Regions:
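A Rossmann-like FAD-binding core segment of flavoenzymes
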Residues: 19-40, 47, 115-209, 501-505
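Mid-to-C-terminal Rossmann-like scaffold of FAD/NAD(P)H-dependent oxidoreductases
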Residues: 224-337, 368, 372, 376-402, ...
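Glycine-rich dinucleotide-binding loop and its adjacent helix/turn
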Residues: 54-116, 151, 201, 207-209, ...
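Short hydrophobic core segments
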Residues: 48-57, 176-184, 248, 326
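Rossmann-like dinucleotide-binding cores of NAD(P)H-dependent redox enzymes
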Residues: 3, 96-98, 104-160, 238-244, ...
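FAD-site-proximal beta/loop scaffold in flavoenzymes
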Residues: 69-93, 164-167, 172-250, 345, ...
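Beta1-alpha1 glycine-rich phosphate/pyrophosphate-binding loop at the start
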Residues: 1-23, 61, 110-133, 268, ...
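Rhodanese-like catalytic fold shared by cysteine-dependent sulfurtransferases
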Residues: 357-368, 372-399, 403-409, 416-449, ...
Length: 506
């Protein structure tokens, strides 16, 4: 079924013969024909081609566990699937729904079901939802889903489904009137395999830079193919709409003799999770390390627009870069404002081989209603530049718990009233406004970890201390707000002892 267009409008506007309810069941490469079956009448007929373009997409993955064929279990691939799911929920008056899978589809399905007033559990076998984001950034979105009433389960996979519940690998059972499988997708390659076309190492159709398959008369685009990743320098599968539409344009160009070779993908994505916009591009820090890159990252929390504006909100921004070159490898942004704009800037730089040096002086448009004079992307580059040059040292929020539990020395340079509303256990409060008079209280014989709310005041404190002879001071990236966001979800889910006296997300 067509959604945005119909066969009549295709014919009237573009002179295209669009055939719905029609399935291609065979490709005869020798004769350059396809066999088509009308799914309503079962009639079969043959069409010939000069060039054939394949875009069968990808099918939902159904795990090999008991219960996946039960009538209350659904997958989501298209509008028809959504309508079937919606009808079943209404007819059963289903109140408890389990969504299996924490990727984009799973998160979006869970959110919409929760907004419809259902009790929703999201189950993800990996340690986090939304793998295009690093673990530290995903914690912000997991907290948001939890705050909105979704029961988020991570690190526990699906073991089976009964008529009343889902059974997890841990043995836990979750009541479920409806189960939605959103574990991922696999390329629909049955037809092309039967036709003898080459399948790549990733399981997608192998194509060249012009999306030509192993048959020079057959092209393939979309979720069914593997694509070249320009940072990893290897084929990957990337089921995204943006690359798919560019592939379609490139195929049309090539058929008509227009040179337009594919240069590869970097994987730029975005999603809304309730009140937050989230976007990512390139490699996560984890993916970059796993690929063999020597990398570092900076995490900056800055206003998305001038702080005096009533709609100003914190924007969480992570920048991943290669050492020692400073080449930018990836970025992630999460906030209530325009996260996608910031990530699009980084995507452009990655595509052009840009570095931290390029980004720190990049001239971007500015208005108090939309940004700050020094945008968060510039700020992140300045921080990275300072770290690379050795002007100060930083520690990431992921390392703070171990430091606290080992008795490390923390100095909190927020004001006394901020400190009273929540702080790292054992931290010493020396407000930045009092620092120069109280420097003698800070030891020189062991590492001192300095933090504030978002790492800006603590950076100033670190530089002041270094200028006064302290060479043992380290800035906590993300500082107290970042620590609270990083720790909160796992603290609540596992019941472990918090490392803060109280969480403060303001």
């Amino acid at each position: 079924r067509l959604v945005l267009m119909n066969p009549n409008s295709f014919k009237a506007k573009y002179n295209l013969d669009a055939r719905t309810n029609s399935e291609v069941i065979r490709i005869n490469r020798a004769k350059k024909t396809i066999t088509v079956r009308n799914v309503l009448t079962n009639e079969e007929y043959t069409e010939s081609y000069d060039k054939l373009v394949l875009s069968p997409g990808a099918a939902p993955i159904v795990p090999n566990v008991n219960g996946t064929t039960l009538e209350h279990v659904f997958t989501v691939r298209n509008v028809v699937d959504i309508e079937r799911l919606q009808k079943a929920i209404v007819e059963k008056d289903a109140q408890n729904i389990a969504v299996i899978g924490g990727g984009y589809i799973g998160v979006e399905v869970a959110e919409n079901l929760r907004l419809a007033g259902r009790n929703v559990t999201l189950v993800q076998s990996a340690p986090q939802i939304l793998r295009p984001f690093d673990f530290s950034m995903a914690q912000i979105l997991q907290k948001e889903m939890m705050d909105q009433g979704i029961h988020v389960v991570v690190g526990d996979g699906l073991a089976g489904i009964t008529t009343e519940s889902v059974i997890l690998a841990s043995g836990k059972q979750i009541k479920a009137d409806i189960v939605v499988l959103a574990i991922g997708v696999r390329p629909e390659t049955k037809l092309v395999e039967e036709a003898g076309l080459e399948i790549g190492t990733t399981g997608g159709i192998k194509v060249n830079q012009n999306y030509v398959t192993s048959d020079p008369h057959i092209y393939a685009v979309g979720d069914v193919i593997e694509v070249y990743h320009r940072l990893l320098h290897k084929p990957v599968r990337l089921a995204l709409a943006g690359p798919a539409q560019r592939q379609a344009r490139a195929v049309a160009d090539h058929i008509y003799g227009i040179a337009n070779q594919n240069k590869g993908v970097i994987g730029s994505t975005s999603i809304q999770v309730f009140n937050y916009a989230a976007a990512a591009t390139g490699l996560t820090e984890e993916a970059a390390r796993n690929a063999g890159f020597q990398v570092d990252s900076v995490y900056v929390i800055a206003p998305d627009k001038v702080g005096l504006m009533p709609s100003s909100n914190p924007l969480h921004f992570k920048l991943v870069y290669e050492l020692p070159t400073g080449r930018i490898l990836g970025a992630q942004a999460i906030g209530k404002g325009n996260a996608d704009k910031r990530v699009d800037v980084i995507a452009t730089l990655i595509t052009m081989g840009g570095t931290i040096e390029d980004l720190k002086d990049l001239e971007l448009s500015y208005s108090p209603m939309y940004s700050t004079a020094k945008d968060v992307v510039n700020m992140a580059a300045l921080v990275a530049n300072n770290v690379m040059a050795g002007r100060f040292r930083q520690v990431h929020v992921s390392a703070v718990r171990d430091l606290v539990e080992s008795g490390a020395y923390f100095v909190d340079v927020r004001e006394e009233n901020e400190f009273a509303n929540g702080h790292i256990k054992g931290a010493v409060n020396i407000p930045l406004s009092q620092l120069r008079e109280r420097m003698s209280e800070i030891p020189k014989d062991k590492p001192v970890y300095v933090h504030c709310r978002s790492a800006q005041r603590s950076y100033n404190a670190v530089m002041a201390l270094q200028g006064s002879g302290w060479d043992n001071v380290v800035n906590v990236s993300g500082s107290f707000l970042g620590i609270c966001l990083y720790e909160y979800f796992t603290d609540v889910q596992t019941g472990r002892e918090p490392i803060v006296t109280a969480y403060n997300f303001k």
